[in-house]
Amino acid sequence: MVREKVKVSTRTLQWKCVESRRDSKRLYYGRFILSPLMKGQADTIGIAMRRALLGEIEGTCITRAKSENIPHDYSNIVGIQESVHEILMNLNEIVLRSNLYGTRNALICVQGPGYITARDIILPPSVEIIDNTQHIATLTEPIDLCIGLKIERNRGYSLKMSNNFEDRSYPIDAVFMPVQNANHSIHSYGNGNEKQEILFLEIWTNGSLTPKEALHEASRNLINLFIPFLHVEEETFYLENNQHQVTLPLFPFHNRLVNLRKKKKEQGFQYIFIDQLELPPRIYNCLKKSNIHTLLDLLNNSQEDLIKIEHFHIEDVKKILDILEKK
């Protein structure tokens, strides 16, 4: 008896790194693929992953510098080749790696003449420097220079305020983004309904994380963002005959409408047009297409009526109420 082999497509998603290189101490590159994906899924994942890579991953930066010898951040100090502003800019570019929480202090204390590099920074145990050769300043005379530093771990970026200084300490623009760039592209294959996609993801980092580490952290952050949706306590709306209609998060629409009517019953709702409410364009167009032209028309509809409107969402109901209560 000969048994014929049957091919079964399990559609198990697989990802792998197809290219990895270190261009310098402060530039890593990685290229990854994820497949097989159904049509449209690659773009969904690619956009979300790129945003998570660029905005959700924490990094470590020097955020403040302090020295008794610095009168202001655009001054020059005798015996130092660079201006104070240039020194602060150089400190801004120092790439650090850490697992710290909150802020830590660091110190530079050197005697000239000579070059000051990242190697001269005395760091707390939880912080390390990626490139010890990064230049900070040049001392041209035998002077002592001590600079106190504040180190923070955060995400995104923090821009210094022009007058944000304390006792001769100066804020430094901080970019807490270990991922310098991320791109995604899509390759489609197959025919008709069997069409599938491969997602290509390219990641460049500053060396404080490898692209693979960045991909893992971005993935974890995305998962954590979506976990709450798995545990939402749903409340069920019922019609008057108790037949099940729809399951949605409950907004106290009716009670808020009653309060609105009590507060504004002296006003003629039929003379207030929705054009006057400054609604977002999409909500305005949805209401107009449903022949809702005045505030009276709007308030005569229940929450259930409104969410039946094409392209109208439960969040739009809350948005309308928020706008009305401010009027």
Curated annotation (Swiss-Prot):
This is DNA-directed RNA polymerase subunit alpha. One of its GO terms (cellular component) is mitochondrion. Keywords: Chloroplast, DNA-directed RNA polymerase, Nucleotidyltransferase, Plastid, Transcription, Transferase. The gene is rpoA. The N-terminal domain is essential for RNAP assembly and basal transcription, whereas the C-terminal domain is involved in interaction with transcriptional regulators and with upstream promoter elements. HAMAP family: RNApol_bact_RpoA (MF_00059). In plastids the minimal PEP RNA polymerase catalytic core is composed of four subunits: alpha, beta, beta', and beta''. When a (nuclear-encoded) sigma factor is associated with the core the holoenzyme is formed, which can initiate transcription. Its EC number is 2.7.7.6. Residues 1-233 are annotated as: Alpha N-terminal domain (alpha-NTD). One of its GO terms (biological process) is DNA-templated transcription. Residues 266-327 are annotated as: Alpha C-terminal domain (alpha-CTD). It comes from Barbarea verna. It is an enzyme of class 2 (transferase). Its main location: plastid. The keyword Protein biosynthesis does not apply. Belongs to the RNA polymerase alpha chain family. It catalyses: RNA(n) + a ribonucleoside 5'-triphosphate = RNA(n+1) + diphosphate. It is found in: Plastid, Chloroplast. Pfam families: RNA_pol_A_bac (PF01000), RNA_pol_A_CTD (PF03118), RNA_pol_L (PF01193). One of its GO terms (molecular function) is DNA-directed RNA polymerase activity. DNA-dependent RNA polymerase catalyzes the transcription of DNA into RNA using the four ribonucleoside triphosphates as substrates.
